[in-house]
Amino acid sequence: METMASPGKDNYRMKSYKNNALNPEEMRRRREEEGIQLRKQKREQQLFKRRNVELINEEAAMFDSLLMDSYVSSTTGESVITREMVEMLFSDDSDLQLATTQKFRKLLSKEPSPPIDEVINTPRVVDRFVEFLKRNENCTLQFEAAWALTNIASGTSQQTKIVIEAGAVPIFIELLNSDFEDVQEQAVWALGNIAGDSSVCRDYVLNCSILNPLLTLLTKSTRLTMTRNAVWALSNLCRGKNPPPEFAKVSPCLPVLSRLLFSSDSDLLADACWALSYLSDGPNEKIQAVIDSGVCRRLVELLMHNDYKVASPALRAVGNIVTGDDIQTQVILNCSALPCLLHLLSSPKESIRKEACWTISNITAGNRAQIQAVIDANIFPVLIEILQKAEFRTRKEAAWAITNATSGGTPEQIRYLVSLGCIKPLCDLLTVMDSKIVQVALNGLENILRLGEQEGKRSGSGVNPYCGLIEEAYGLDKIEFLQSHENQEIYQKAFDLIEHYFGVEDDDSSLAPQVDETQQQFIFQQPEAPMEGFQL
């Protein structure tokens, strides 16, 4: 697991936290396996590649109908690309070149399955389109060739590779300075598709020095569609974790993104927030650069945006920033983030609720004042309700938030969580299949029991007030059951809790694990009945 905080913070936490079972690196969590899962999903709010599909007007309809007849007939074995089309493409007549390039472009714009492979497998056709990109005296030909190449690059990685190998990228970057906005916009679109293909393609485009001309375009353009496409391309240049882009090559975009966050256009805002979420996903140095660009207050404001596609990436960016150290987390808190996060916990979208819980869990991994701020914002009652009733993926994040608070909180703060009823939902998590969450719940209960032991000693009664609450929630039965868990850390923790907090005079020797000296591991009696009660 990645290191979440600076060494100084690590040392401080290890000394100050009463519970060392969850180390600081674990408590402050970047997206791990769920981040990977999210990246693999086709997100409705953001496409990494886009095809330019023409809106057909009546004048072009007859020609397009004939073209489609030709395309449909190709499914019977005839080629959609005739020898005549290829000859016209290589003609010296610029009118024929334009007409034929337009034909190719229309074919490549057809839904749902454009004949990309047939086009790229026709010798020298892609190279010819790249040649046409250089024809500064004929901007219409440049535009049509750029459009055709854009749609080829919207395909598979292999199809995108053909466009790169034909030498299109440096020329597209030059065209960002074209005098013709249509050509500029189509070049941006093509570069966005290429950068969105893979980290290798993204880095190649960055190494071709795209950033300065792209930022210049963004600064000067007054055309909304151009700005939208440019911000989308920029977000693709910032995207990716394995590996991430070289930060020095993308960080110069931060001042421009800071300005774009004040746009009134939802599409533009969404891509600007996604770009910031990618830039803030990493070590604290990256987080600091994002903070220094002055975006935090506006990102927090955008948490309340009425369009889900804006609020979601804004929340991701805010969540990434609070994976930083306590000072970085405090910047977000100082922007009045907690009332916004409380509001998002009631979102109709489960993914937003889950992400809000994850963000809060990283705040409760902070210092005691930050835990108190979460208490003062009345967030914990909602978290405990989520812990009881939500989908499992959201309950997991709420469990982290509560256990983190029991790890770093004061006795008074822990008592407050107990008074809200956190014990029963933590006990309920002891029967889930996810071993990590079972450990998180056990650690939360251990922190509560440790406080109860201190209170029993102080009162002179010697009675731990929280043992009874755990027994009432059937927690003791579940902890006993975990002594036969396959995970060594879980069964050892369960055994230790039973022995330390629920021990009886006549110890039942059958509960104690035996030690296999040869394997250096514990051996447990197999339960007679199969383990039940597991939930997904």
From Swiss-Prot:
Sequence motif Nuclear localization signal, location on chain: 45-54
Annotated keywords: Acetylation, Host-virus interaction, Phosphoprotein, Protein transport, Repeat, Transport
GO terms under biological process: entry of viral genome into host nucleus through nuclear pore complex via importin; maternal process involved in female pregnancy; NLS-bearing protein import into nucleus; positive regulation of cytokine production involved in inflammatory response; positive regulation of transcription by RNA polymerase II; positive regulation of viral life cycle; protein import into nucleus; transcription by RNA polymerase II
GO molecular-function term, one example from the UniProt record: nuclear import signal receptor activity
Tissue and organ distribution: Widely expressed.
Annotated IBB domain residues: 1-60
NLS binding site (major): annotated segments: 147-239
Cited SUPFAM superfamilies: ARM repeat
Family annotation (InterPro entries): ARM-like (IPR011989), ARM-type_fold (IPR016024), Arm_3 (IPR032413), Armadillo (IPR000225), Importin-a_IBB (IPR002652), Importin-a_IBB_sf (IPR036975), Importin_alpha (IPR024931)
Any Pfam family the entry gives: Arm
Family the entry assigns: Belongs to the importin alpha family.
Name by which UniProt lists this protein: Importin subunit alpha-7
Organism: Homo sapiens
Lineage: Eukaryota, Metazoa, Chordata, Craniata, Vertebrata
